[in-house]
């Protein structure tokens, strides 16, 4: 039995292992702002014409031509604005954002019945630097699991009620082979409210706008309203650095009897570019159409001759993201640790644990550190880390 469980765990690496969610995380920053009343869905922010200086770093939009000026919260989601999300987070402040994320169960295991589930990487600090807050607001510098993301999106789809996820198995003929354990049989009765229904309605409308008139256009399904969000995140490789991309899309149909959330993350896509809307969106569309038209008119599923991501190919085209957490290092309070070879998520987590000021430069893994490991930490100590792409033998 244990061997079977471990095999299932390996198959579900995307679901239970941590990864940077990228822009699919922006909706939770917006949710927190609405919950704490620092913004409404129609509040507007000046998006600095595409770039904004934060802690001597530039926060930029994904495309150089995206020079947004005044932009509403709904349009921040629609166009996936990094600058707009940063402004939203700065008004909100980290303690309030953290409160909402904790309510949505980020930083904790969901308790799904699969061994080896990660809690993700989420700071326990009471506050963070402006740059860290900016990065976290749009899904960088934080690591989550696929199950955490789907459960949190389901809370929005459920009108603000969070339901603990559980694993159900059925055979190809839909005969149940694994039922809910008795203690979970009343799972639906254990739902807890984490967001107001009014706010989730506004968030859903923004996500629908993102699909119908924004970055998620390739996930549109005729005759249905789809709420969803794209992501294009840097890919963490086996050595803890960044190489390539992870393309993502999470969404759900609105006002339907068959309710579901689908999360698609494609590791290092080889065709169709690498943007989440272009690569993961069509996969979501095919899977969602199957769910929506199942036992109805499924003839529509054959209408994808121009799409590389045919349903028959979905299984082979999706390699679930597997991120290996960097080997733990011994940390001594008051002493600068050795951060050579670590990625930015890990160094950020370490610096927060030690209350250490860090300046990051570059991308990849740490190739240069000053002052060196073993140096006593003073009140004015600032550790400068330079990152470079990892090398391979």
Label for each model-derived stretch:
Residues 1-22, 28-266:
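Beta-lactam-recognizing serine transpeptidase/beta-lactamase-like catalytic domain environment
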Residues 122, 223, 264-278, 282-393:
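Ligand-recognition elements built from short beta-strands and adjacent flexible loops
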């Amino acid at each position: 039995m244990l061997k079977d469980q471990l095999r299932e765990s390996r198959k579900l690496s995307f679901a239970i292992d941590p990864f940077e969610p990228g822009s699919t995380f922006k909706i939770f920053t917006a949710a927190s702002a609405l919950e704490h009343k620092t913004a409404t869905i129609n509040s507007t922010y000046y998006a600095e014409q595409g770039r904004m200086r934060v802690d001597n770093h530039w926060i930029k939009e994904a495309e150089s031509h995206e020079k947004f000026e005044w932009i509403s919260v709904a349009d921040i989601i629609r166009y996936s604005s990094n600058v707009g999300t940063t402004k939203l987070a700065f008004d909100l402040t980290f303690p309030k954002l953290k409160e909402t994320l904790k309510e949505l169960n980020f930083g904790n295991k969901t308790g799904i019945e699969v061994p080896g589930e990660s809690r993700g990487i989420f700071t326990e600090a009471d506050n963070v630097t402006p740059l860290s807050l900016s990065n976290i607001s749009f899904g960088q510098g934080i690591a989550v699991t696929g199950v955490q993301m789907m459960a949190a999106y389901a809370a929005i789809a459920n009108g603000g009620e969070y339901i603990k996820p559980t694993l159900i198995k059925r055979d190809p003929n839909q005969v149940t082979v694994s039922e809910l354990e008795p203690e979970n049989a009343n799972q639906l009765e254990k739902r807890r409210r984490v967001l107001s229904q009014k706010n989730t309605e506004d968030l859903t409308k923004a996500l629908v706008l993102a699909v119908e008139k924004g970055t998620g256009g390739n996930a549109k399904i005729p005759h249905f309203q789809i709420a969803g969000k794209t992501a294009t995140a840097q890919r963490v490789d086996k050595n803890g650095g960044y190489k390539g991309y992870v393309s993502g899309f999470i969404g759900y149909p609105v006002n339907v009897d068959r309710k579901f959330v689908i999360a698609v993350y494609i590791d290092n896509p080889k065709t169709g570019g690498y943007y989440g809307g272009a690569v993961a969106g069509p996969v979501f569309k095919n899977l969602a159409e199957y769910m929506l038209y199942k036992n109805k008119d499924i003839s529509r599923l054959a209408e994808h001759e121009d799409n590389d991501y045919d349903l028959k190919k979905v299984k082979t085209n999706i390699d679930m993201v597997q991120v290996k957490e960097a080997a733990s290092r011994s940390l001594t309070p008051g002493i600068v640790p050795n951060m050579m070879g670590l990625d930015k998520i890990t160094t950020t987590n370490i610096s927060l644990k030690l209350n250490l000021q860090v300046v990051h430069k570059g991308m990849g893994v740490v190739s240069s550190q000053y002052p060196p490991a073993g140096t006593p930490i003073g009140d004015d100590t600032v550790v400068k880390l330079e990152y470079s792409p990892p090398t391979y033998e």
